[in-house]
Amino acid sequence: MTAKLERLQRALGYTFKEPALLTLALTHRSFGGRNNERLEFLGDSVLNFIIADYLFGRFEEAREGQLSRLRARMVKGVTLAEIAREFDLGEYLRLGSGEMKSGGFRRESILADALESIIGAIYLDAGFEVCADRVLNWFEARLQKLNLKDTQKDSKTRLQEYLQARQLNLPRYEVISVQGEAHAQTFHVRCEIDGLSDATEGTGSSRRVAEQKAAKQALLALGVDQ
């Protein structure tokens, strides 16, 4: 075990009995040979259960849909990448030369996948209870801020339901432009709706984020939101 990986383990708050699991969890498919995709698959499932179990116990009056939206907020790629950056996970990743040169160690999806892989690795190395303890510790500050007011449906869903209830055509989203390097792109999206003379627009670090912002502007233009 190198001093570098020992530093990462201190940040994670967990020391592996089988260090090879940690090395595998940090190995992107671009590196060649065995990679972390299977651990990512396992970690994704373990993470979803840990967060679901926590939310089920904490929000006893919450409906299924509310619990699902709270969980989605916690396990989405943006959140996972944020936590990965708190551990400086990018500097420990094993990437192929091309992926490294293109800034893959900063890419949100790669960081999020690596964090899920580490969760899967801890689960295999120590079992569910230890893994759950670590995950809840990493997510603690974010979990404490959750409340049922956070379960409102996202802007795209609300806009779609508003239009469907009035038997109107669904919104049309179009990417106007994509700017920046692959690891730090900015998407500019237009949303067109029958009945609104002007299209609304939104920008974000992904197409999904930009579409959500454009939908929010449409809700404001329609007078649904204030």
From Swiss-Prot:
EC number: 3.1.26.3
Pfam families named in the record: dsrm, Ribonucleas_3_3
GO cellular component terms attached to this protein's record: cytoplasm
Entries under SMART domains matching the protein: DSRM, RIBOc
Residues the record marks as active site: 44, 116
Domain of life: Bacteria
Record-listed Mg(2+) binding positions: 40, 113, 116
Cofactor section: Mg(2+)
Domain DRBM: 154-224
GO molecular function, one term: metal ion binding
Enzyme's top EC category: hydrolase
Annotated catalysed reactions: Endonucleolytic cleavage to 5'-phosphomonoester
Functional description taken from the UniProt entry: Digests double-stranded RNA. Involved in the processing of primary rRNA transcript to yield the immediate precursors to the large and small rRNAs (23S and 16S). Processes some mRNAs, and tRNAs when they are encoded in the rRNA operon. Processes pre-crRNA and tracrRNA of type II CRISPR loci if present in the organism.
Similarity-based family: Belongs to the ribonuclease III family.
Binding partners and assembly: Homodimer.
PANTHER family documented for this protein: RIBONUCLEASE 3 (PTHR11207:SF0), RIBONUCLEASE III (PTHR11207)
Protein's name according to its UniProt entry: Ribonuclease 3
Naturally occurring in which organism (per UniProt): Hahella chejuensis (strain KCTC 2396)
Encoding gene (name): rnc
